[in-house]
């Protein structure tokens, strides 16, 4: 098999993935050496299945496609499961913090859409949430915003889990919207 056929086969394989892949950021770094500058690239990728599983990854390489591939592989290994209410929003308001990044997530009524800025929107698109209100304060650094958003998503507790912790029936637990 020639190099060209291998390349084409890999491209087809990547496009047939069952995951939704969203590129969040690409950054170029420069190392100054005696002969000039050497450039490296870092990429942040969010991967989700559209049904409640999502992960993020950071890849670094000398070329952009290789950095994206590394980030995608890492994201697929670090996926978390998030409970989604009615297949479209989150159960309750939650706060996530990481570094200087603060994120507030609120459930939204049907038809609202994803009202989120910066690096948060690709996460909600990949996870399968279609109605949510999100606000970020502090930093606009994509690394910290993604980690803060994941911290907020991990704080979400569906009524069944809350009922089990309290020793109640699930129908007796009411989560305020």
UniProtKB/Swiss-Prot annotation:
Record GO terms (molecular function): rRNA binding; structural constituent of ribosome
GO BP terms in the entry: translation
InterPro entries: Ribosomal_Su5_D2-typ_SF, Ribosomal_uS5, Ribosomal_uS5_bac-type, Ribosomal_uS5_C, Ribosomal_uS5_N, Ribsml_uS5_D2-typ_fold_subgr
Membrane-crossing residue ranges in chain numbering: none
The S5 DRBM domain, residue ranges: 19-82
Gene3D superfamilies tied to this protein: 3.30.160.20, 3.30.230.10
Alphabetic keyword roster: Ribonucleoprotein, Ribosomal protein, RNA-binding, rRNA-binding
PROSITE patterns xref list: S5_DSRBD (PS50881)
GO cellular component terms, semicolon-separated: small ribosomal subunit
Family: Belongs to the universal ribosomal protein uS5 family.
HAMAP family documented for this protein: Ribosomal_uS5_B
Role summary: With S4 and S12 plays an important role in translational accuracy.
Free-text comment about domains: The N-terminal domain interacts with the head of the 30S subunit; the C-terminal domain interacts with the body and contacts protein S4. The interaction surface between S4 and S5 is involved in control of translational fidelity.
Name under which the protein is recorded: Small ribosomal subunit protein uS5
Species, as recorded: Magnetococcus marinus (strain ATCC BAA-1437 / JCM 17883 / MC-1)
